[in-house]
Design a protein with these regions (language model features):
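A generic structural motif
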Residues: 48-52, 99-119, 123-124
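Acidic, Ser/Thr-rich peripheral helices and adjacent loops at domain boundaries
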Residues: 124-134
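RNase H-like, metal-dependent nuclease domains and their acidic two-metal-ion catalytic environment used
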Residues: 1-104, 134, 138, 142-256
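Intrinsically disordered, low-complexity segments enriched in polar/charged small residues
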Residues: 111-113, 132, 138
């Protein structure tokens, strides 16, 4: 642990890493935070995290780039509400970080994760709305309950314990923080997007469905078999030899 950063696993050569970012709004002693995930396969693992309430938005992109570079140039998805847009622009245009994830606004279909291609309706990160937050929190619940996301950090567990339902949304209790939880929510939204599945070759929803089907089948009583002797070859003067061959008498009509 150093200056707000905690490393749980050092980077390995081949895995795909994803960094999700929640930028402080500058109020109520808010934290700027990001989490680095090993997204190579499910269950996903948290390999590093950063959380600091003193860092300035103008300096934050340098820390984000340094750690993301360290983890095989991790794919970065930033929440661009408020000051997040400034951080995303700095990463893309000033620091020229290549692996920024872009999101496309698709009208009624909402926001869709994409690559790094600019165009109409594209933005350098995820704009957190009621819709995306609802999808993200629902996916996060499913990932945790099905053991598809391993959480090994005390600060994250602490924030999850105070992350409550309020009206039709979820947020931290009065006086608590949810910066790290929002990084989890962003990742959970991301993990169910088609582009993410193509990027990592992991369909976690399909795996969860298969696991559920296997559990149902395991709980079912096995099918029984009834031997009524009607199709028994030995009941028709036939028999099996020691080698497993079936011998039966040959029947034929007179004159054939």
């Amino acid at each position: 642990s150093h200056a707000g950063s905690d490393v749980y696993e050092m980077p390995i050569k081949d895995p795909t890493y994803v960094t999700t970012v929640d930028v402080a709004r500058g109020v109520n002693n808010d934290y700027s935070a990001f989490i680095v995930f090993d997204a190579t396969k499910a269950p996903y693992k948290i390999v590093a995290k950063y959380r600091n309430n003193d860092i300035k938005p103008i300096v934050f992109p340098n820390v984000l780039k340094k750690i993301s570079d360290y983890y095989n140039k991790a794919y970065v998805l930033i929440e661009i509400n408020d000051l997040g847009q400034q951080v995303a622009d700095s990463m893309q245009f000033e620091l020229e970080y290549d692996n920024m994830m872009m999101v496309t606004q698709r009208g009624r279909a909402g926001q869709v994760l994409g690559g790094g291609f600019s165009g109409r309706g594209n933005q350098l990160g995820l704009r957190m709305t009621k819709g995306t937050k609802k999808i993200g929190t629902s996916n996060l619940k499913s990932l945790i309950e099905s053991d598809k996301l391993i959480i090994n950090d005390f600060d994250i567990v602490s924030e999850l314990s105070t992350f409550i339902s309020r009206g039709k949304s979820f947020e931290a209790e009065q006086g608590a923080h949810d910066d790290l939880v929002m990084c989890l929510v962003i990742f959970s939204w991301c993990a169910n997007q088609r582009y993410f599945k193509e990027l990592t070759n992991v369909d976690v929803r399909g795996q969860m469905f298969t696991d559920q089907q296997n559990a149902i089948e395991a709980d079912m009583a096995p099918f029984g078999f009834i031997d009524d002797g009607l199709n028994d070859p030995e009941g028709n003067d036939g028999y099996f030899t020691d080698s497993g061959e079936l011998w039966q008498p040959v029947t034929y009509r007179k004159g054939e």
